[in-house]
Amino acid sequence: LVSDARRDYFLNQQNGQASTHILDSSTLPAKDLEVRGIVWLPRMMPKAIAKLRGELPPETMYGCGGDRRFFKANNIHPAEFLRATWAYEDEPEKLIDWVTTRRGS
């Protein structure tokens, strides 16, 4: 499912053109940062965008232990978060609202 989201983004948003940019993992927000009381969300958002764009470096894993804790705590599947990130790519507040809603479900 995660690969399907990435493939769909690649074909529909990137028109089949690979990005030449690679995320610098040292620029990711700290692991203990939170927004609206949701730990890891500030870090998760740029990771998901980089995953969608094919810009994650080999040393950075989408779905690592911290990501899995985030997904479990907020009742979200990893592929579902990618699709929501895509839907709200230019509206981070709406993505935060979506996570907040999922957290309560």
Model segments located where?
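Polar/charged low-complexity regulatory segments
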Residues: 1-57, 105
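Amphipathic alpha-helical packing elements
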Residues: 56-99
